[in-house]
Curated annotation (Swiss-Prot):
Organism: Methanocaldococcus jannaschii (strain ATCC 43067 / DSM 2661 / JAL-1 / JCM 10045 / NBRC 100440)
Keywords on record: Membrane, Transmembrane, Transmembrane helix
Bilayer topology: Single-pass membrane protein
Presence of the UniProt keyword Transmembrane helix in the record: yes
Annotated protein name in UniProt: Uncharacterized protein MJ0418
Broad class of where this protein is predominantly found: membrane
InterPro entries according to UniProt: Tscrpt_reg_TrmB_C
Stretches that traverse the bilayer: 7-27
SUPFAM superfamilies: TrmB C-terminal domain-like
GO cellular component, one term: membrane
Domain of life: Archaea
Subcellular localization, as worded in the UniProt entry: Membrane
UniProt xrefs under Pfam families: Regulator_TrmB
Amino acid sequence: MIIMKKIGILEIVVILSILITSVSLAYKFYSNNGNDYEFDGNQMYKCAWVCEKILNKNFPLNATIIGKWTLSKKPFNGEVKIYDAKGGTLYAIYNGTPITIGGELAYQEDIAAKKIILHPIGKSIIFYELNPIEGKSFRDIANEIENTTKNFNGLNIVDVIVEGSMGVDSKTYTPVERQKIMNNLDVDIKKGLGLYFVDYGIIINGKIHLNTLKNLDNYINSSNISTSKLTIYVVVNNSIDEIPNKIKENYAIITLG
């Protein structure tokens, strides 16, 4: 009975410590209102947790990483774009190349981080759905989407993200041509964009930045494009209080905090 009582007390202490840590992290995250978040290299699980919360809300996320390359041991101090976080590992893009970031003692990841400073992009996201769009080129599709963002003139738009699928009439691509297209879109594919090559065309599925969508004509020659219903995420560097009431009454809004 005494042993069972001791185990019970230890379990309570562990549970309380987990709850206190979770509450403190949640308070820090939800009360931050868009400022930076700083972590030491021994706080990777906490850092990844915050990254997931930010990314799941569709906010773009940059970070300053201070540490070293695990292979060469050379110092690393640079800005990266984080696109995923799992366990104690961050997945990011550095100079156009995917890299992984672990804690100070990491050896499997590309970077062993001593310090991580997260920089979420934007303070609010206005999102809405668009009915299917048709066009001859990716520029046509992008222009239609961009026209809808004119409803937010006066706000500081920092990014526009498009989610949905597109059927593209083009040609049947050879293996070499397919690989070249995939190479050009490597970063977006790493972020989750799906490319499906079919006879006489391509199906594109997932999330894509509007600026990337505009440039797809450089890699894919299309004759016709038809989209599914699209979800548009307009990232603005304005707090909820700075967004006009007319917009708040007509659109759904996500805030960082």
